[in-house]
Swiss-Prot record:
This is Regulatory protein FanA. The keyword Transmembrane does not apply. InterPro entries: Adhesin_operon_reg_prot (IPR004356), Fimbrial_Adhesin_Reg (IPR053721). It comes from the Bacteria. Signal peptide: none annotated. Keywords: Fimbrium biogenesis, Plasmid, Transcription, Transcription regulation. The keyword Transport does not apply. GO terms for biological process: regulation of DNA-templated transcription. Trans-acting protein involved in the regulation of the biogenesis of K99 fimbriae (FanC).
Amino acid sequence: MRSFNKDEYLFREKLGYLVKGMVKARCFQLLVELSSIRSSRGIYALEDYFVKGRDLKEVCNEHDITPSYVTSLLRKLQEVNHKVIDILPYYRN
């Protein structure tokens, strides 16, 4: 059985969850465009986390934002990703 690190464990509940360092840059850009996230600090922090695979603490320090704020943004982006996955079957048929 695969063990999850702390970051992955938070977002493993649904099929298709975003994983730190595993999101393609273009996919990330599209998800941000679909989301309500507009803070440039927040967007750069999320990009460092999801695309570049940097640790949450490191990202918070570099972008001068709190871990709780980044976590709320992570959840928002995860929700957008899940909505995209949920709607995909309607476009495939």
